[in-house]
């Protein structure tokens, strides 16, 4: 494993640890507390989201825990395999490693939340509309970096063409 990839996996471990330690501290010491952060927009207001995903919660879809665990596990595997594929096809790239660290950390935190917390301990309330946690920030950082990279035409991302889905599918099938 290349040094850059080792740093990426260390970053994943650190990001997941930070997310989970924050949740443990909040659950044990601050769960019943409400504090303004930037009133009237942001508040610290911990709550458990037992709907397992934002989409399931907002649309009241009723999709259960084990279905969510399976979906997140499959997505995590696909994210991992796609990262390995990009490294094999294009070599290591700093922005790809950073993006992977955030999206894979978000996926791992989501999986941990569903398995061990029976949902997500969210704690930042936005405008009395929705509540989020650090894992959601990780996923949004990934999304922002992806958009920025596409906008700035990152050289590795520019090499990715219309055949990537077909090539990635072949890569996965060879792994099986």
Question: Which residue ranges define each predicted feature?
Answer:
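Alpha-helical transmembrane bundles and membrane-interface segments of multipass inner-membrane proteins
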Residues: 1-176
